From Swiss-Prot:
Pathway: Amino-acid biosynthesis; L-tryptophan biosynthesis; L-tryptophan from chorismate: step 5/5. One of its GO terms (molecular function) is tryptophan synthase activity. Keywords: Amino-acid biosynthesis, Aromatic amino acid biosynthesis, Lyase, Pyridoxal phosphate, Tryptophan biosynthesis. HAMAP family: Trp_synth_beta. It is an enzyme of class 4 (lyase). Tetramer of two alpha and two beta chains. It catalyses: (1S,2R)-1-C-(indol-3-yl)glycerol 3-phosphate + L-serine = D-glyceraldehyde 3-phosphate + L-tryptophan + H2O. Its cofactor is pyridoxal 5'-phosphate. This is Tryptophan synthase beta chain. Belongs to the TrpB family. GO terms for cellular component: cytoplasm. The modification N6-(pyridoxal phosphate)lysine is found at residue 99.
Length: 420
């Protein structure tokens, strides 16, 4: 019997058995946060679908974000790779990534709910940046929680968050990365849920967050369906997106979930090896298992006691130990395929598309592009669309060190001397 594809959750779960095996999602949170989540549920089914909210969000998407973002035909890459390669360029949205779609929608919802302060976690800094920008535009206080390691490797985004007026909290507990920032943000929300709104950055967490984030990010695939008609009359053959928590992938895939002839491929962080702690692969690995963490049930990299494992990726946005519940479900029912790309492959893909297409994709998006290059070794004449979820400006402290270490070291030394 064909397995049912859940395009939205039912009773908070994606999957046939509510809360049991083969069902992901749910609402596993401390009792103190239940009133806040019930309030959010009410807003999701009320304000979120109201004409007034939708009209204001549509206007902000156009006049503040700069939507629609373009669909670009990669002429040179297409010739070299012998397939028609298209790029949905979310990096040209305000703040440089797809994260603004979700952050702006949630901050606007917070304003309609009469909240005064916004809390958010961030890994690569793009969600924090987008949330800070949305708060600046809509006039709400903003506090961002970010791992100490991520702050060090994403300093440009931290500077810009603070420029937008946000207070950035450095999280020094645990692995000092995204999973620890999420924990701290949840703790803070539990203290002040009465006047604060938690803007969750990916399509995960307790219900209704996975649905809210998917709905807001699905503007990507909604636009894409219209844009492809200008290029070709048929459907694309393959869609490829990187997967950290899953927000850009769900936004990119949503309007194609029922188009079964379109292959949907998610690309995880292959890091530097296959051992535990050397990557962030949650699918097709013996290191991941079903579990409950940070408010939801899904597939996690975790130890035998259920503690989230350390991960690695050159990309700060892909090193999360869990995966969104809807993507876990879509993998289980066979609708979304998963691959991985190593740090090395991502850097090579970044260099390839920079050289031949004049774009600098974010390291996250470069993982998707690495998978595109690999796919093209075995297929020809297909229409392949990759989601460029963000620009690579934010990654200069990583990419410059990795690609031109001596030049970068010389530049930094000279700059320090000038400042001194």
């Amino acid at each position: 019997m064909k397995k049912k594809i859940f395009t939205e959750s039912k009773n908070g779960y994606f999957g046939e058995a509510k809360g049991g095996n083969h069902a992901f999602g749910g609402q596993y949170i401390p009792e103190i946060l239940l009133p806040a989540l019930k309030e959010l549920e009410k807003a999701y089914h009320g304000v979120f679908v109201s004409k007034a909210y939708k009209k204001e969000l549509k206007s902000l998407f156009k006049h503040f974000v700069g939507r629609p973002t373009p669909l670009i035909y990669a002429h040179n890459a297409s010739k070299i790779l012998k397939n028609d390669i298209y790029l949905k360029f979310e990096g040209l949205a305000n703040t440089g990534a797809h994260k603004i779609n979700n952050a702006l929608g949630q901050v606007l919802l917070a304003k309609h709910m009469k909240k005064k302060r916004v809390i958010a976690e961030t890994g690569a800094g793009q969600h924090g940046l987008a949330t800070a920008a949305a708060c600046a535009r809509l006039g709400l206080e903003c506090e961002i929680f970010m791992g100490e390691i991520d702050i060090a490797r994403q300093r440009p985004n931290v500077f810009n968050m603070e420029l937008f007026g946000a207070k950035v909290h450095s999280v020094s507990s645990g692995s000092k990365t995204l999973k620890d920032a999420v924990n701290e943000a949840l703790r803070e929300w539990s203290k002040r849920s009465d006047d604060s709104f938690y803007v969750l950055g990916s399509a995960l967490g307790p219900y209704p967050y996975p649905d809210i984030v998917r709905d807001l990010q699905s503007v990507i695939s909604k636009e894409l369906k219209k844009q492809t008609k200008a290029y070709f009359s048929s459907l694309p053959d393959i869609l490829v997106a990187c997967v950290g928590g899953g927000s850009n992938a769900m936004g990119f895939f949503t309007h194609y979930l029922k188009e079964e002839r379109v292959r949907l491929i998610g690309v995880e962080a292959g890091g530097i090896g296959d051992k535990e702690g050397e990557n962030a692969i949650r699918i097709n690995t013996i290191n991941a298992s079903e579990g409950i963490a940070q408010g939801y049930k899904s597939l996690f990299l975790q130890d035998k006691d259920g503690q989230l494992s350390d991960t690695h990726s050159i990309s700060a946005g892909l090193d999360y130990a869990g995966i969104g519940p809807q993507l876990a479900h879509l993998y289980e029912v066979g609708r979304v395929e998963f691959q991985s790309a190593t740090d090395k492959e991502a850097l090579e893909a970044l260099s390839f598309f920079a050289q031949y297409e004049g774009i600098i994709p974010a390291l996250e998006s470069s993982h998707a592009l690495a998978a595109v290059i690999r796919l093209c070794k075995d297929i020809k004449g297909k229409k392949i669309i990759a989601n460029i979820s963000g620009r690579g400006d934010k990654d200069i402290f990583i990419t410059a060190k990795a690609l031109t270490p001596e030049h970068w070291k010389t530049f930094l030394s000279e700059e320090i001397a000038r400042i001194g």
